Amino acid sequence: MLNNKVLLVVNSVYQLFTAVHMKRSILAKKEADLLVTDITAVLHTYIPRLKETGLFAQVIFGKTKEWNQKYAAAKGDTLDEGFQNASHTLRWMLNEELADYSEVYFSNFDPFIRMLACQFDRPSCEFIWYEDGFSTYVIDYLREDRAPINRHPAGGKIREKVRRVLLYEPHLALRGDHLINQALPKVDRNDQELKLLLNYIFDYQKPEERMDFIFLEQSFRAEGIQTNDLALMRLCQQAVGPGRFLVKPHPRNPENVPFQLGLTRKYPTEAPWELFLFNENPEHCTTITVCSNAALTSRIVFGMDVNTVMLYRLFEGKVLWKEDAILKQYLRKFRRQFAGNNYYVPQTVYELQDILMYLGGRHEPTDQSFHHYSRVSGRKLS
């Protein structure tokens, strides 16, 4: 009998948002298990509500973070040790047993997923990569010279299992690998059933305070990357006024540094940004970021044209350690081919100030430090 059961693995709130959307669209006729990991701390809190929806046959919790950290950059004998006795390791990590699956959907090529590829090493089980922000569009994770784990017999096994990747905008892909890019259906903002389902899972509450200018933080501090993003936040706060400026913290950053520095009040929810776009009227707010793909999801996921200010021309530092040049191509391609009329990329801090004022920022003189902000160095993402 043909096995039609699938497994979806989620490591972040954005992945969970997309996994629920996939289950109600392209996977509607298939029985599915959901595996929620501890990569993002808040994810486990959604498990009771996920179970109550009955959307998935089984909701499994996996403690994969520590194991991933141990083996992500490992080599040789250490990797041999990690991939030995995969069945025992999986029983130790997961609170429920896995079933037999025809397809496994995942977003990250972490050691855990690579171990699953070894566990389900048979032609009848396909591994399918799905959207996880710009990294899915620009990084060839399986290139042999990218990481030692790709050259390991077990760690590289997943290369034989993956043939395609599901993206909201396949034509944006620039990875340079041989995977087939296929389209995920965009989310229909008029789909009330999906909206109610996601609101229940994430316990979404309508913001009580104004969210006129929202800065989407990125995971630079979690990855140890030195940048000027906090200085850029301060510039934006001065341009629009503290009461109208809010920073959405990145869930992987260990501390809410912008809040600690007084750059923002507390962000009101841990639900994915996409759920705010789904529920509210984002046409009346402005999204600001260095280059977070979340700022592009209004266009990529929903087909909307929301005020968006991208600060990557003012940014100091590297966003990606190895694929920064490809990321620049991705951002240029998005701007040329996909961006709407309300998409802005300021070249100078003075242009940034003018754009924010045009979009409704305050018109009184700003703090002097704005005008004396140092020029961006040659390391900027151009």
Which residues does each PLM region occupy?
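Leloir-type glycosyltransferase catalytic cores
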Residues: L320-S382
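Active-site regions of enzymes building and remodeling cell-envelope glycoconjugates
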Residues: P48-G62, S124-E126, E144-P148, F245, ...
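C-terminal structured domain segments
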Residues: V20-M22, E31-R49, H284-Q347
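Active-site and donor-binding regions of nucleotide-sugar-utilizing enzymes
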Residues: L7-P153, A295
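Donor nucleotide-activated moiety binding/catalytic core segment of transferases
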Residues: P251-L296, I300-V301
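Short loop/turn segments at strand-loop or loop-helix junctions that form parts
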Residues: I60-Q69, N108-D110, F127-F134, R210-R221, ...
